[in-house]
């Protein structure tokens, strides 16, 4: 398989162009060049500094990649929502990091994928094989995994152009001020707590990143808890949690962004779940939509808060999508 890009304008360096298109670092692009996978106008690219002219065709070969499996299978139960030759859709459990980082010592989702001998894309670092987008460690729900580089590039493109739809369910301690609210701002590390992100009220600052979310109230309990839907237009670290904090609202079970660190007397995890995901299949271009079931712990907690009949009604996927479309 291969993917072809057309340079829309002059570029001083091909590595800068591909880094932008593939949403990876220039070093990762250089690795692809070293492996003989990048061609410009049908000629193999040898250096990242190759200048591009408007209309140049850049071809990226996508060989079949089978990561070396781990010696020991990980004791994790992860539901596979969908699988074909190009991709996986998984229901990630909470308390599971997606990929390795310097501070991460425990097994990750990528470790599990390798232990199951899945073929995975390798456009990212080896710790991130297959990973097109991420979920926070404590967040459960739908995540798409690329089995090959062609799929990885196509899905990354859909993320970049906002063609991939991602919808979350969250339980708030208090209702939204309005039935529908949106946050559009820049996010950066909180200078007072490096574990947190903070929404900037002013313009963009160094190392901050643009972000946008929409929120809609789905169901309010008698004691004032609010089940909401959240739609992502970008996918920044802790985006939903930081945006809600900007609105002075907090998710039940979120000890990092919660009021005084605690929002519930019970020992529960954060009530945040990636519920719906939709995108075009990279090969067939068929539009796909997946409803990723709430995990048992979150569903049982919600049943304590809301009437089951009302809960089932608002969790209907068409109702959630309509809630964001309707004005």
Swiss-Prot record:
Pfam family, one: PseudoU_synth_2
Catalytic activity: a uridine in RNA = a pseudouridine in RNA
Keyword match Isomerase: yes
Protein keywords: Isomerase, RNA-binding
Residues in S4 RNA-binding domain copies: 12-79
Lineage: superkingdom: Bacteria
Biological process according to GO: enzyme-directed rRNA pseudouridine synthesis
EC category: isomerase
Name of the protein described by the UniProt record: Uncharacterized RNA pseudouridine synthase jhp_0682
Organism: Helicobacter pylori (strain J99 / ATCC 700824)
Classification lineage: Bacteria, Pseudomonadati, Campylobacterota, Epsilonproteobacteria, Campylobacterales
